[in-house]
């Protein structure tokens, strides 16, 4: 499995339920890397997408504790282990914070876009790989 993320200089990834910013070159990179591959994400991350809809041309494996949550074009799982049991090796973990933390030890590659600035008030963070000896 692999992860893909955009972080600021403090490894922040979000603020107030949204991404820190939307950079067209990074969005294109994300699209190039993930198109044709399964993506694993949480329900709150899905809510940040245009229209709150699953990504096109990808198998969307979505974690949600809400049994009534059933977005068209997505497969919903209430337990991470159930989602991982169906996730092939080429799956991309795409957020959010909790899912990254729970799956990082299962990833063999992390694609990081590092923004050389900080976002005051950021409230969601990716594990700091600069301080992780294994990375």
Residues covered by each model-derived region:
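Enzymes that bind and transform nitrogen-containing heteroaromatic metabolites
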Residues: 1-135
């Amino acid at each position: 499995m692999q992860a893909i993320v955009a972080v600021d200089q403090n490894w922040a990834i979000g603020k107030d339920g949204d991404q820190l910013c939307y950079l067209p070159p990074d969005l294109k990179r994300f699209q190039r890397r993930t198109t044709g591959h399964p993506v694993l994400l949480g329900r709150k991350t899905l809510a940040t997408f245009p229209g709150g809809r699953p990504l096109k041309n990808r198998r969307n494996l979505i974690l949600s504790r809400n049994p009534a949550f059933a977005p068209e074009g997505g497969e919903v799982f209430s337990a991470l282990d159930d989602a991982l049991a169906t996730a092939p090796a080429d799956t991309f973990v795409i957020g959010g914070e909790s899912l990254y933390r729970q799956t990082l030890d299962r990833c063999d590659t992390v694609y990081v876009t590092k923004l050389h600035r900080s976002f005051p008030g950021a409230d969601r963070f990716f594990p700091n790989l600069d301080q992780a000896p294994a990375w």
